Curated annotation (Swiss-Prot):
Function noted in UniProt: Essential component of a corepressor complex that represses transcription of neuron-specific genes in non-neuronal cells. The BHC complex is recruited by Ttk88 and probably acts by deacetylating and demethylating specific sites on histones, thereby acting as a chromatin modifier. May serve as a molecular beacon for the recruitment of molecular machinery that imposes silencing across a chromosomal interval.
Lineage top rank: taxon: Eukaryota
Name of protein: REST corepressor
Disulfide pattern: none
Keyword entries, A-Z: Chromatin regulator, Coiled coil, Nucleus, Phosphoprotein, Repeat, Repressor, Transcription, Transcription regulation
UniProt-listed InterPro entries: ELM2_dom, Homeodomain-like_sf, SANT/Myb, SANT_dom, Trans_reg/Corepressor
Length: 590
């Protein structure tokens, strides 16, 4: 009795059914068990057994019914409700009532496919009439010659009801829509996606030949298969190619049959084997002999899409220096491509005020070009002025050279006259020759000083010299004075050749002479003075620039009447001429 009550209390707890499986799941079994327990425990009477059986029977339907199952109990143990699970997960429906009812098959004659809402378009259906070899030839022609892909070529063939000739003839009439993405397009899309994200309008700026719909379509197909790092993906593919070439067992890396861990282990093993082989083949001497090449390879900057603060500063300075010359700016930054620089400019033009920087660059460039255009006429004018100035100076130098040549010629002629005259004189005049030579030497010195002064004055005033040379030819006054006395008084011949010069030239001539004389007297006292001082015999005659007057032409004539007539030598001529051609005076000395 006690055991039966305990069992009933375990089954029913405060009016709730136990979570665990009930020991009295079946009624008959429960009654039998309880009866046996009670019978074994107490044999006093049948009334207690009846009450126990009633209690047991009343508790059994609540504890466990035939409708409940272990699945329901397991569901509640897991904390899941029936509403969250479909009825097909709870029980297996088997029987006629749970099968789908198929409609009867409609004959082909009664079918109306145009009345159906959802219809598929058949683009290809294989046939046995065309052999595989001809079909492959047709597809290759469509690909290589007309740019079709395999599906488009087969669709054209099916459109013409498997007629190869008509399909080949019709291939040229249609241009297939190229929706293929090349490797360059894919790389550009990845870079643009890293910069702009899902802003397809900005991505289209880097891929102008693609439409927005094509970009969106490719994005969703690329999103499913892309990896976190495309650079690592390319490196992994390169390693796979190396491993496949160097693997001895020929097994493919990363097969679907192996797990991820086995795949990684196999990759690492094969990479290690390949590296071991490379290490064995490396020659240490060659590596040591070429350290510079290794350094240059390692020193090459790595292209990165991420902009560091230093790179931003360099880019701003380069934009200020080169404007919108993006290739040059990319070379300056050295870690960015032209596309990176262009994108940086577009994204940060407001943040860093890049438009204003470019305007300043263009304004400075225009100013430089304008300055160059202005300097070119100035240089031409300066060159023309130099050429014009060189012409008078050349004329002055030419006139000075001609005047010097005239002076030299007249000096030589006078010297020749002196030599002939000295030969005609008696031999008793030989002791006086050194004095005559000294006088001639000083005349040459005076001529040299005159020439220097003339060149200096013409150089200092080039324009005045040019005007003077244009208005008047180079003038030269030649005065030949012949001292004719008796044999006791030595006759000396002083030849003075002066050129028409400015006051500077005349002052220079006067400074070279120690004792200039305006008149020549024939007294014996002056002759003796000339013998004692030969320089006094040199007459400095300066011709003025405006008048061209002769210096004391009448006064310079020697009064020869003092000497006796018997002692005078044959008559000699004294010629005085000016270079201007205005007057030529000849004097006859008796």
């Amino acid at each position: 009795m006690v055991l039966a009550e305990r069992n009933t209390t375990d089954v029913v707890r405060n009016g709730r059914r136990s979570r665990g499986p009930s020991p009295n799941t079946h009624t008959t079994g429960g009654v039998t068990n309880s009866a046996s327990l009670v019978g074994s425990g107490n044999n006093s009477g049948h009334s207690g057994n009846a009450n126990a059986n009633e209690k047991t029977t009343t508790a059994v339907p609540g504890a466990g019914t035939p409708e409940s199952s272990d699945d329901d109990n397991s569901t509640k143990r897991n904390g899941k409700s029936k509403a969250k699970q479909s009825e097909y997960e709870e029980k297996i429906r088997v029987g006629r009532d749970y099968q789908a009812v198929c409609p009867p098959l409609v004959p082909e004659a009664e079918r109306r496919p145009e009345q159906m809402n959802e219809r598929a378009l058949l683009v290809w259906s294989p046939t046995k009439e065309i052999p595989d070899l001809k079909l492959e030839e047709y597809i290759s022609v469509a690909k290589e010659k007309y740019g079709y892909n395999g599906e488009q070529a087969l669709g054209m063939l099916f459109w013409h009801k498997h007629d190869l000739e008509r399909a080949v003839m019709d291939l040229a009439n249609f241009t297939p829509f190229p929706d293929e993405w090349t490797i360059e397009d894919k790389v550009l899309f990845e870079q643009a996606f890293q910069f702009h994200g899902k802003s397809f309008h900005r991505i289209r700026q880097m891929l102008p030949d693609k439409s927005i719909a094509s970009l969106v379509k490719y994005y969703y197909s690329w999103k499913k298969t892309r990896h976190r790092s495309s650079a690592m993906d390319r490196q992994e593919k390169a390693i796979k190619a190396v491993v496949k070439d160097g693997s001895e067992n020929g097994s493919e890396v990363g097969s679907n049959e192996e797990s991820d861990n086995d795949d990684k282990i196999q990759k690492n093993r094969q990479v290690m084997e390949q590296l071991d082989k490379e290490c064995e083949t490396i020659n240490v001497d060659d590596v040591l002999s070429k350290p510079a090449a290794a350094n240059t390879e390692s020193a090459q900057p790595r292209i990165s899409a991420r902009w560091l603060p230093d790179e931003i500063q360099v880019a701003l300075l380069a934009i200020r220096e080169y404007g919108k010359n993006f290739p040059t700016i990319a070379k300056v930054v050295a870690t960015k491509t032209e596309a990176h620089v262009r994108t940086f400019y577009l994204n940060n033009r407001r943040r860093y005020n890049l438009d204003q920087i470019v305007k300043e660059y263009e304004a400075g460039k225009s100013e430089e070009s304008g300055a160059e255009e202005q300097t070119e006429p100035a240089v031409d004018a300066a060159a023309a002025g130099a050429a014009t100035a060189s012409a008078p100076s050349a004329a002055d130098s030419t006139s000075a050279a001609s005047a010097t040549a005239d002076r030299k010629q007249s000096t030589e002629n006078s010297n020749n006259g002196v030599e002939t005259m000295q030969e005609s004189l008696p031999k008793k005049e030989d002791p006086k020759k050194p004095e005559l030579a000294a006088a001639v030497l000083k005349i040459g010195v005076a001529e040299a000083a005159d020439a220097v002064a003339t060149v200096a004055s013409s150089t200092a005033s080039g324009v005045i010299g040019a005007a003077t040379s244009a208005s008047k030819p180079s003038t030269s006054a030649t005065i030949t004075i012949i001292d004719e006395s008796d044999t006791a008084t030595n006759s000396s011949s002083d030849v003075v050749t002066t050129g028409l010069a400015t006051s500077t030239g005349s002052s220079a001539l006067s400074s070279t002479t120690s004792a200039p004389a305006s008149k020549t007297q024939t007294s014996s006292e002056e002759l003796s003075a000339q013998k004692s001082n030969p320089a006094s015999g040199i007459a400095a005659i300066g011709a003025a620039t405006g008048g061209g007057q002769t210096a004391n032409s009448s006064g310079s004539k020697r009064d020869s009447s003092v000497l006796p007539v018997a002692e005078q030598p044959p008559a000699k001529k004294i010629a005085l001429s000016t270079g201007g051609g205005s007057s030529v005076a000849e004097f006859l000395a008796n």
